[in-house]
Each structure stands twice: as structure tokens, then as C-alpha cells.
């Protein structure tokens, strides 16, 4: 079966196939199942974009959606994630979409369950569908990855988006740079080079900003965030020095006037809401791949 757990498990060919399917969906192609097929969304962390994007994608494909609430489930009675998935599998669910606060929650599950797991984000680890929608957005803009210079800016240590994107974009031929406060650098992420933000601003093709993840920090104070914006955020002054034709990206939710000046969120360079739109098409493509017998997706097996 075709789990989607991390970007490292996808070859360049597989990435290209998923992006091609996503582009087809973006251009109006329809694909709907004619048989009743249940898919469950299990979100153990809060989500707006990923959760609803998956649900829209599922419904566009004609799938029947089961939205799981941990607070109202037997998880509150101590049921394990494995038993929860096996329960859903037993009652006829054909795939599960999971977001979980634990890094690599899927390691012990992937060989024990008989339905595809689509990782919607694991702790500070991986976020493959966010990466794929970012790749689609970049491809739409530049038509290529080879030779592009991309800055990933902000809370690199705690960002699953940074980890997934840096690895995939490097594989596809882009050059990755990081800019981050010293305490938020991730020395384990070896797919890019750290440089000062102000050096990168006029050089890069893509300015990919990361959310300050205050829920993963001990404190979140207004004065600290103001200082962050001035030192590490995309201010109006920095945007004015950006390279001609370069774009701004952000996985959202956006902390306005922290990672990016509020007036830049929907400026001409910004592709933030385009990323959200592309999320639906990418997740349709990922679901097609996971359910080939139902949706006519890719029939080769991805070994994980």
C-alpha cells in the first residue's frame, strides 16, 4: 500500500507524478469514486488549513469522510493509536489521515496496519503534503526547481515544514539557505546553509517564512515578537529589496507583524493564499495515489 509519511520516501519520479496529478486537478480534471469509500481524518493537534483542505479534497473525490475527535473517542479511555486505526480498518475505512504531536508516530504503525496512512504532520518532524503543495506553487511560478535559490526563514528547529521542504527541494536541484535566530537553528538539518537574512533578501527566488510556533516554546510575549519582526521578519523595507520576480511563501497560520508585515500578506509577491488553494489539489493527488483501486491512482507500491 502507498503510505505517505515523509518526503525522503518519495523519489523524484514519484514527486513528479503527484505534482502532475495535482496540476490536472487544478486545471479542472475530475475524478470521483462510484463506490462508497470511507476515509478517516484523525487530528490530535489543532488545524485549520490541513484538516479542511483534506476534507474538501476527499469530498471532491466522492469519498465519505469520517472526522475523528480525540476528545470524544476511546483515546480518552487509554486506547492506543494502533487500536484506533485497527478499529477504523475493521469497520471498513480504506485510508487514514493523521496529524499527531509525537514525532514519527507512524514508525511502529506502518508495518502493522493494512490501510494507507497519510501523514498530515508529526510533531516537529515531517509535513509531506505541505511540502508537496509548496513544490506545486514553486513549479507553477518558475516551471522548474533546478537552480532556484530558496531561503527558509524563522523557527527552523521546531518546523516540520522546514525539514520536509529543505530535503525535497535539495533533491530536486534547488539551493537552500536558512536564516534563523541562533536559539532556533537546527544543526541536524544539513540540507541548507545558514546566512544572515539581510544577505539573502536580494539573492533568493523564494522567501519561505516559517511560523513562530509559540505553542512549542515556554513563553510568548508581545515585546519578544516585536523584536523578532525587526530582526528576523519580512518587514516592508526588506520586501522592497527583494529580487525582481521573487515570491513570498508561508505555510500559515500567519502571525502578522511577526514573521511578515501585515500589509505584505496579500501583496503582489505573496503566494500564501495560492499555497492554500494548491493544498486541495495536492491532497486530491495524494488520495488518488493511496486509493488506486478506487480512484485510478498510481498502482506501484512505495516501500516504507
UniProtKB/Swiss-Prot annotation:
L-aspartate binds at residues 77, 160, 211. GO terms for molecular function: amino acid binding; aspartate carbamoyltransferase activity. Keywords: Pyrimidine biosynthesis, Transferase. InterPro entries: Asp/Orn_carbamoyltranf_P-bd (IPR006132), Asp/Orn_carbamoylTrfase (IPR006130), Asp/Orn_carbamoylTrfase_sf (IPR036901), Asp_carbamoyltransf (IPR002082), Asp_carbamoyltransf_Asp/Orn-bd (IPR006131). It holds the Pfam family OTCace. Carbamoyl phosphate binds at residues 49-50, 99, 127, 130, 252-253. Its EC number is 2.1.3.2. GO terms for cellular component: cytosol. Pathway: Pyrimidine metabolism; UMP biosynthesis via de novo pathway; (S)-dihydroorotate from bicarbonate: step 2/3. It catalyses: carbamoyl phosphate + L-aspartate = N-carbamoyl-L-aspartate + phosphate + H(+). It is an enzyme of class 2 (transferase). PROSITE patterns: CARBAMOYLTRANSFERASE (PS00097). GO terms for biological process: 'de novo' pyrimidine nucleobase biosynthetic process; 'de novo' UMP biosynthetic process; amino acid metabolic process. It comes from the Bacteria. PANTHER family: ASPARTATE CARBAMOYLTRANSFERASE (PTHR45753:SF6), ORNITHINE CARBAMOYLTRANSFERASE, MITOCHONDRIAL (PTHR45753). Heterododecamer (2C3:3R2) of six catalytic PyrB chains organized as two trimers (C3), and six regulatory PyrI chains organized as three dimers (R2). Catalyzes the condensation of carbamoyl phosphate and aspartate to form carbamoyl aspartate and inorganic phosphate, the committed step in the de novo pyrimidine nucleotide biosynthesis pathway. Belongs to the aspartate/ornithine carbamoyltransferase superfamily. ATCase family. This is Aspartate carbamoyltransferase catalytic subunit. The gene is pyrB.
Amino acid at each position: 500500500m502507498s503510505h505517505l509519511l515523509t518526503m525522503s520516501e518519495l523519489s523524484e519520479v514519484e514527486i513528479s507524478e503527484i505534482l502532475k496529478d495535482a496540476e490536472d486537478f487544478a486545471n479542472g480534471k475530475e475524478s470521483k469514486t462510484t463506490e462508497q469509500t470511507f476515509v478517516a481524518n484523525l487530528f490530535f493537534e489543532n488545524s485549520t488549513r490541513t484538516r479542511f483542505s483534506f476534507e474538501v479534497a476527499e469530498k471532491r473525490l466522492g469519498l465519505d469522510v469520517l472526522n475523528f475527535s480525540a476528545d470524544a473517542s476511546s483515546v480518552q479511555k487509554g486506547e492506543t493509536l494502533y487500536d484506533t486505526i485497527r478499529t477504523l480498518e475493521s469497520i471498513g475505512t480504506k485510508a487514514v489521515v493523521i496529524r499527531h504531536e509525537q514525532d514519527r508516530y507512524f514508525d511502529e504503525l506502518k508495518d502493522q496496519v493494512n490501510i494507507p496512512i497519510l501523514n498530515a504532520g508529526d510533531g516537529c518532524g515531517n509535513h509531506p503534503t505541505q511540502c508537496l503543495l509548496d513544490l506545486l506553487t514553486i513549479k507553477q511560478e518558475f516551471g522548474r526547481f533546478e537552480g532556484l535559490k530558496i531561503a527558509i526563514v524563522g523557527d527552523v528547529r521546531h518546523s516540520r515544514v522546514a525539514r520536509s521542504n529543505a530535503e525535497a527541494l535539495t533533491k530536486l536541484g534547488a539551493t537552500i539557505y536558512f536564516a534563523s535566530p541562533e536559539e532556533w537553528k537546527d544543526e541536524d538539518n544539513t540540507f541548507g546553509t545558514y546566512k544572515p537574512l539581510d544577505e539573502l533578501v536580494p539573492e533568493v527566488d523564494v522567501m519561505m517564512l516559517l511560523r513562530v510556533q509559540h505553542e512549542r516554546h515556554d513563553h510568548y510575549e508581545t515585546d519578544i515578537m516585536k523584536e523578532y519582526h525587526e530582526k528576523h521578519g519580512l518587514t516592508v523595507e526588506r520586501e522592497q529589496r527583494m529580487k525582481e520576480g521573487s515570491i513570498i511563501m508561508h505555510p500559515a497560520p500567519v502571525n502578522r507583524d511577526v514573521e511578515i508585515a501585515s500589509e505584505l500578506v496579500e501583496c503582489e509577491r505573496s503566494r500564501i493564499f495560492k499555497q492554500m488553494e494548491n493544498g486541495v489539489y495536492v491532497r486530491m493527488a495524494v488520495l488518488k495515489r493511496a486509493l488506486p483501486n478506487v480512484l485510478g491512482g498510481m498502482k506501484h507500491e512505495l516501500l516504507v
